[in-house]
Design a protein with these regions (language model features):
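Short amphipathic coiled-coil heptad-repeat segments
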Residues: 136-142, 267, 271, 287-292
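ABC ATPase nucleotide-binding domains
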Residues: 251-271, 278-287, 303, 308, ...
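Proline-centered turn/helix-capping motifs that create local helix->coil transitions or kinks
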Residues: 277-281, 291-301, 378
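A structural signal for long alpha-helical coiled-coils and helix-turn connectors
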Residues: 103, 107, 241, 270-273, ...
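Amphipathic heptad-repeat alpha-helical coiled-coil/stalk segments that mediate oligomerization
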Residues: 297-321
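ABC ATP-binding cassette signature C-motif
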Residues: 1-253, 312-538
Length: 538
């Protein structure tokens, strides 16, 4: 249990929130949402003790332990991978180190012997004898093979370090768990494992995430940071979003009678409660929904960008033909081989792979930015493309302001460019910012504005939700669903894939798995699982 009392946090003159009084209880997973800069990560840092609040206090239940997903991926470079995970249970780790120091002595005093006996008793109580095997199992579940367990953290890639940090946070079943963007850099299979793991925990969990499906799958309550306040609502992200949209519509219709509004809200709650009846947390969630005061629901202050992709030209029937394509990484690793497919009009294809470099390599090849190791590709004569690369660093090395930067990529005067930027939530003095000082989210919104200028009939998107907040992801997602052209994309966002893709192509070192089916059917199909095992392990 975590009790927050009279918490206030401000930076300079800017007050993030004040008078925060909340109690987070065991058995609940709280999804923390809010606009970029609202203070989601700051709240977790204040709870963990990493940040001193301006006022107020945070208390854990008596004797309880708190674990945090570390954001510094270099902090443990000098340690063994397995030891890093074991450090997640600090009392156990300290016990192990003290035992090791005692037993390394050439001679032990009587006091040493008594202390060793105490340590052994506590070691057993903390399941110390199974600790290494449990830590190893946690690493394996998160995609870290046994061959890496004895290596130094400094030898791992950043993607691998992220998984070790997550294993460290989860290890030892802490009473309270704080997870800031836990799905970042995880493949979809590992995210699915994490969803299953968290759905069965009995601890108190707070999680910040921009993955809507993940939030919906795991959270029983939503912590909304808005209007300078921190408010807890019953239900998951989708319930919060739909209820907020409903409240906005009602606010806009001022003539609607109060009683009609109340009935509409109550009917909405009943309907949503029925829709979540299949969830694992259904009993507790339904009880919370029943207690919800409909008068508490209010429109969000958050803004959604206006993302509209329009085609200048209708595509013909020949979109893209790929034959025998192969890509090899710099170290000689085969990313994919013998890739053959034809893209037909209207198809929105998600590309998957165990190795994220495979999708990037494919997109770079078909955009002419990289040579294939073998094979050919051919675009249809009517096709125009707009490409959103994974790494956009090169686009933002100039000191141009946003208007001048965007003007490079399409026709139109300053007013037109400001209009595009305004729809992407850049207004007033923002449009005069230098592009080389933009945040990751601001850069991504600029890249999306650039793509809209192209009026292309085929969009190529490499992990497009990176750095975007939930509002931008929602707006992006909604427009792509209605886009009439073709889309080729990769993503770690389950909801994004499920709602946009109508075809799935998985790239493996031994060819492709190519299916016309939705994503949920694909990941839960036993036949597909068997086929994947075969294609990756030939």
């Amino acid at each position: 249990m975590i009790t927050v009392s009279n918490l206030a946090i401000q930076f300079g003159k800017r007050v993030l929130y004040k008078d925060v009084n909340l109690k987070f209880t065991a058995g609940n997973i709280y999804g923390v949402i809010g606009a970029n800069g609202a203070g989601k990560s700051t709240l977790l840092r204040a709870i963990s003790g990493d940040l001193e609040p301006n006022k107020g206090s945070v208390e854990l239940g008596p004797g309880e332990r708190l674990s945090v997903l570390e954001q510094d991926h270099f902090k443990f470079d000098e340690y063994r991978v397995l030891d890093t995970v074991l450090m997640g249970h600090e009392p156990l780790w300290n016990n192990m180190k003290e035992r090791e120091a005692l037993y390394s002595k050439l001679e032990m005093t009587e006091d040493d012997g008594n202390r060793a006996a105490d340590l052994e008793l506590k070691f057993a109580e903390m399941d110390g004898w199974e600790a290494e095997s449990n830590a190893a199992q946690m690493l394996s579940n998160l995609g870290i093979p046994e061959a890496l367990h004895e290596k130094q953290m400094s030898e791992l890639s950043n993607n691998e370090k992220v998984r070790v940090m997550l294993a460290k946070a989860l290890f030892g079943n802490p009473d309270n768990l704080l997870l800031d963007e836990p799905t970042n850099d995880l493949d979809l299979d590992t995210v699915q494992w994490l969803e299953e793991y968290l759905s069965n925990v009995e601890q108190t969990v707070l999680v910040v995430s921009h993955d809507r499906h993940f939030l919906d799958a795991v959270s029983t309550q939503t912590v909304d940071i808005d209007f300078g306040k921190v408010t807890v609502f019953a239900g998951n992200y989708s319930f919060w979003y739909e209820s907020s949209q409903l409240a906005l519509r009602q606010q806009q219709n001022q003539r609607q009678k109060a009683e009609e509004k109340r009935k509409e809200l109550e009917e909405f709650i009943r309907r949503f409660s029925a829709n979540v009846a299949k969830s694992k947390q259904t009993t507790s969630r339904k009880k919370m929904l029943e207690k919800l005061n409909v008068e508490e629901i209010r429109p969000s202050s958050r803004k959604y960008p206006g993302i509209i992709f329009q085609m200048e030209r209708e595509p013909g029937n020949q979109i893209l033909e790929v034959e025998g394509l192969k890509a090899v990484d710099e170290d000689g690793t085969v990313l994919f081989d013998n890739v053959n497919f034809n893209i037909e009009k209207g198809e929105k294809v998600v590309f998957l792979s165990h190795n994220p470099k495979a999708m990037t390599a494919l997109f770079e090849i078909i955009n002419g930015n990289r040579e294939a190791a073998a094979g050919t590709f051919k675009w249809g004569v009517t096709i125009t493309t707009a490409y959103l690369p994974l790494d956009n660093t090169e686009f933002f090395k100039s000191d141009k302001n946003l208007v001048d930067w965007l003007s490079q990529y399409g026709p139109g005067n300053e007013v037109v460019m400001k209009g595009f930027l305004g729809r992407m939530l850049f207004s007033g003095e923002d449009v005069l910012k230098k592009v080389n000082v933009l945040s990751g989210g601001e850069r991504m919104r600029c890249m999306i504005a650039r793509m809209q200028l192209n009026n292309a009939n085929c969009l190529i998107l490499d992990t497009p939700t990176n750095h975007l907040d939930l509002e931008s992801i929602q707006a992006f997602n909604n427009n792509l669903v209605g886009f009439k052209g073709n889309i080729l994309f990769s993503s770690h966002d389950h909801e994004f894939i499920q709602t946009v893709a109508n075809r799935i192509i998985e790239l493996t070192p031994n060819g492709t798995i190519d299916k016309l089916m939705d994503y949920d059917d694909y990941i839960y199909s036993e036949d597909i699982k068997a086929l994947k095992a075969q294609m990756y392990n030939k």
